[in-house]
Amino acid sequence: MAKGKFERTKPHVNVGTIGHVDHGKTTLTAAIATVLSTKFGGEAKAYDQIDAAPEEKARGITINTAHVEYETANRHYAHVDCPGHADYVKNMITGAAQMDGAILVCSAADGPMPQTREHILLARQVGVPYIVVFLNKCDMVDDEELLELVEMEVRELLDKYDFPGDDTPIIRGSAKLALEGDKGVQGEQAIMKLAHALDTYIPTPERAIDGTFLMPVEDVFSISGRGTVVTGRVERGVIKVGEEIEIVGIRDTQKTICTGVEMFRKLLDQGQAGDNVGLLLRGTKREDVERGQVLCKPGSIKPHTHFTAEVYVLSKDEGGRHTPFFNNYRPQFYFRTTDVTGAIELPADKEMVMPGDNVSITVKLINPIAMEEGLRFAIREGGRTVGAGVVAKILA
């Protein structure tokens, strides 16, 4: 007998811990889950339950990620924590765990370290919109001035990467004390303050169904007597029969009208985010549409060829290249449903990129693709994945 239906009455938000190795990300993750479970229900987690993160695959890349859930009075959170630095890089670039906000953990005893900076930069590049800071290990620092200094350094670092340093909530505490059940200011109280900061500082994300209509084209059929049907999975928004849509990417943008929505051989009056549908397009010929284009609300997304991106290059062990690549390397870029050839320009100080590296690059595609900042892609050579990336900034 089922124990009743899962009621999701609270809005859902995805978060994750970022920060330097050994600054206390996993301890904090355990502390949040444990403290909040006593207040709002949910499951307490021990450190080693989170640290033994299972492997998962995203875009052919193996990533170790721990998933923890917890609730506050207002929200349900899904929280990701990664054991190793390389896992963070892969996770953020592939979007395996898309974050609505990140919790930056920084040790008060050490201050910002190289990975603190690198994770903030990655968060900026991959479009993590909000960061909340937990200044950890405050029980090891007696000097108030030292705490203020570390706090100031963190705010400056956030500013440097275009996060609002002055407005960012910084909570002081000790994840270790909280996990041990300490009820003091640095223990449980700090975790409750952090939970409040997450609730108030990170806005509730827009649900996919509330977005502007977008559907990547997977297949195109000609049905005699009815016209052209385009199939795919609606990525966001809603499409209603009779609405005007645009076909964007690869060639010149065209306008058409959706005259029918089909799902499982039934006619519907609309399709929405998550649905696998066939859309009947008025006056559109079979050869006017191809896989790799998108159908969208007119004016909502534009085709582009020139952009900067943050990419992770697969190591040899992950089935990637065995050799480095150099400036002007020309692989295929797999966006949504299709490959497009493009040329890579490396930063001036980078002569080559080794398998296992992550790097900021500039790309020029030979055909335009419907593109927005934050769009994920794979880098492929002859059909096998050699890298993963995310569009950081559109140039043209």
From Swiss-Prot:
Recorded catalytic activity of this chain's protein: GTP + H2O = GDP + phosphate + H(+)
InterPro entries associated with the record: EF-Tu_GTP-bd, EF-Tu_GTPase, EFTu-like_2, EFTU_2, G_TR_CS, P-loop_NTPase, Small_GTP-bd, T_Tr_GTP-bd_dom
Keyword set, alphabetical order: Cytoplasm, Elongation factor, GTP-binding, Hydrolase, Magnesium, Metal-binding, Nucleotide-binding, Protein biosynthesis
CDD domains tied to this protein: EF_Tu, EFTU_II, EFTU_III
EC number of this enzyme: 3.6.5.3
Binding residue positions for Mg(2+): 26
Assembly mode: Monomer.
Full protein name: Elongation factor Tu
Underlying gene: tuf1
